[in-house]
Amino acid sequence: MTVPRYAWGRVLFLAIVTIVINTVPAGSAEKPTFYMIAPSLTDPFWVTEQNGAKQAGQDFGVNVVFQAPAQDTGDAGMVPLLQAAIAAKPAGIAIDYTSKTLEAVTTAALDAGIAVVLYNNDRFEGENAPADKRIRDLAFVGQNESISGEILTRAWLPTLQSGPCKVLIVNPFPTAFVLTLRADGVKRALDAAKYPHSDLAATGDEGQNLSLISAALQADKGICGIVGLGNPAANPAAQYVGDNSLKIPVATFDVGAEAAKRLKDGTLTMAINQQPFLQAYFAVANLANQAKYSLKPVNVNTGTSIVTTDNIDVIQKCIAAGRC
């Protein structure tokens, strides 16, 4: 491994803080090796991503190394892992492109002749717009947040009462642009159906959000539906609706274990699942097909799986198997 100046320190750092999910077995030197760099492994979402990468490695007969910082250090924590991955000269790298912080290292990978695909995030908006046009052209595997917001809302609208009533959109992380994109899609669908809506800035704390949602519903009796832009918003909304026997449909993005339980008991009406297992799986599939057959990586939208009480039993089995 060739890393400028502080090589041994970085190698030691990687040995301590990264997780290798598919070590290179003896006699497999002819197999292409791919790196998948993630921001975290402390969230079940990323464990599921890891499972998808591992399965793809087995199915396509390639070596996959899945790495993440030991602590949630955001974009910056992925940079040294990507630099070390480039130095290892793999056949390809899958990058969760969360911001412009990752532009220089992504460009470095492309300059080194390494195949790159993006997964989970391809944040190119505003100040994140990459100067390197090659990055914009990279294949992306993941959920189109804005389109998913529109698809979810259109599917959910028939559960609302007819006539004029308001939808409350609860954002647990107001500074996260990804949730702004989700909200944009939700609002487009609501506007098209002529449903007024209001925004509620919440937090990542479900206990605090329960109080905020309770206050909002008590202050505005015209609210007939709630969209939580993430589980920290939707779970307490569903709890409040259930505890007070209200007939207010609640929709959300992503399906964690708690959200699955609430879909099962009916207090949560609908969710859209971005399918993290498939994000990682198809990212590796793209790289494997390019390395083996020179097939150009393609975009894959994984985020259009609607979950309701009708199919929650299957989804719960999928969650238990580490595939949802």
Language-model-detected regions and their locations in the chain:
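Hinge/cleft segment of the Venus flytrap/periplasmic-binding protein
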Residues: E30, V170, L278-C324
